[in-house]
């Protein structure tokens, strides 16, 4: 009998959530995603030391200002790690915009353009890169602007239906609704244990997937942030799933029959009026879990971005 990983690949695009090239070589995903936390982890891998040196040399060549050098080195390192990963995948790499910019639309647009230029200068076409943005109102608006320039975006830290709806209406290429972090919040609040079927993170992605398909939105749904393989199996059929290498290996090692759960029935309904900024902010605020997790997620990425920049600053 085939393993779960091979069966899942038949109807869901598998994406590796890692900055580790060796892990990517092992699991052979189609796409890969990175974030500031994964880049910080990757920067400690010995084989990446030359990339750090290259990022430092690049930053020094661009500016004499220390603060600008640190920013340029961090951006260059993110792209250099992305370039290494692209050598081993046929699809796209997601590279994240500095989380400190999460409430500044123009700054996110500028950073997205800069990252794409760094990839293009290295010979990588922009259609192989997704710019990752936090799913704040400002991030979604930045995504809308970048998409119109032909720069595809991955809207991340997505915990609520309001965020998902606004992303679809903005016409972004892809969203990353989080599963495990939603489960974490409910477990902490209720003390309950959840099955894959009752998992609130799984239910959230299923609702978003169904809404997108029945309203004819082209935005790709890529479930993210998994705590166990049960959550992944419960979302079989989702457009894409981005999964850590350890859970991908677990799926490879497990044999059994995998049933497709999410299916696009091809029926489309009329779309509702566009969500206004006021409605978005109110709906997000009404959702305590999403409000807390979005804020926590941004703070966490900022902490790791600062750690990465501190390490780079010591080498400048």
Curated annotation (Swiss-Prot):
Q: Mind telling me which InterPro entries this protein's record contains?
A: Aldolase_TIM, TAL/FSA, Transaldolase_1, Transaldolase_AS
Question: GO molecular-function annotation terms?
Answer: transaldolase activity
Q: Which GO terms describe its cellular component?
A: cytosol
Q: Is tRNA-binding given among the entry's keywords?
A: no
Q: List the Pfam families hit by this protein, alphabetically.
A: TAL_FSA (PF00923)
The cross-references to PROSITE patterns, in alphabetical order and at most eight, read: TRANSALDOLASE_1, TRANSALDOLASE_2
Tell me the Gene Ontology biological-process terms attached to this UniProt entry: carbohydrate metabolic process; pentose-phosphate shunt
EC category name: transferase
The keyword GTP-binding is assigned to this record: no
The chemistry this enzyme catalyses reads:
D-sedoheptulose 7-phosphate + D-glyceraldehyde 3-phosphate = D-erythrose 4-phosphate + beta-D-fructose 6-phosphate
Q: In which pathway does it act?
A: Carbohydrate degradation; pentose phosphate pathway; D-glyceraldehyde 3-phosphate and beta-D-fructose 6-phosphate from D-ribose 5-phosphate and D-xylulose 5-phosphate (non-oxidative stage): step 2/3
Q: Where does this one sit in the cell?
A: Cytoplasm
Per the UniProt entry, the Enzyme Commission number(s) are 2.2.1.2
Keyword entries, A-Z: Cytoplasm, Pentose shunt, Schiff base, Transferase
Record's function text: Transaldolase is important for the balance of metabolites in the pentose-phosphate pathway.
The entry sums up its family as follows: Belongs to the transaldolase family. Type 1 subfamily.
- What PANTHER family does the record point to? TRANSALDOLASE
- Fill in the subunit field for this protein: Homodimer.
- Annotated HAMAP family: Transaldolase_1
Q: What is this protein called?
A: Transaldolase
- Source organism (scientific name): Methylobacillus flagellatus (strain ATCC 51484 / DSM 6875 / VKM B-1610 / KT)
Lineage here is: Bacteria, Pseudomonadati, Pseudomonadota, Betaproteobacteria, Nitrosomonadales
Source gene?
Answer: tal
């Amino acid at each position: 009998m085939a393993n779960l990983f091979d069966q899942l690949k038949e109807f869901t695009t598998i994406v590796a959530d890692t900055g580790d090239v060796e892990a990517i070589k092992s699991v052979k995903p189609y796409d890969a995603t990175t974030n500031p936390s994964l880049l910080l982890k990757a920067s400690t891998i010995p084989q990446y030391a030359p990339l750090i040196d290259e990022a430092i040399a690049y930053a020094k060549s661009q500016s004499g200002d220390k603060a600008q050098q640190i920013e340029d080195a961090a951006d260059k390192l993110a792209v250099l790690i992305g370039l290494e990963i692209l050598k081993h995948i046929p699809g796209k790499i997601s590279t994240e915009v500095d989380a400190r910019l999460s409430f500044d639309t123009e700054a996110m647009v500028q950073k997205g353009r800069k990252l794409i230029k760094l990839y293009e200068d290295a010979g990588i076409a922009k259609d192989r890169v997704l710019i990752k943005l936090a799913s704040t109102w400002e991030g979604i608006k930045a995504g809308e602007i970048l998409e119109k320039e032909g720069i595809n975006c991955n809207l991340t830290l997505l915990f609520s239906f309001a965020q998902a709806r606004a992303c679809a209406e903005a016409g972004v290429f892809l969203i990353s609704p989080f599963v495990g972090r939603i489960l974490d919040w409910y477990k902490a609040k209720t003390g309950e244990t959840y099955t894959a079927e009752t998992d609130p993170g799984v239910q959230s992605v299923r609702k978003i997937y169904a809404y997108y398909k029945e309203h004819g939105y082209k935005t790709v749904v890529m479930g993210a942030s998994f705590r166990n393989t049960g959550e992944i199996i419960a979302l079989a059929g989702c457009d894409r799933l981005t999964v850590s290498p350890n859970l991908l290996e677990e799926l490879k090692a497990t044999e059994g029959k995998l049933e497709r759960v999410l299916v696009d029935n091809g029926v489309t309904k009329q779309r509702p009026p566009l969500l206004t900024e006021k409605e978005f902010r109110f709906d997000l605020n009404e959702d305590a879990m999403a409000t807390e997790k979005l804020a926590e997620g941004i703070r966490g990425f900022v902490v790791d971005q600062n750690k990465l920049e501190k390490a780079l600053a010591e080498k400048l």
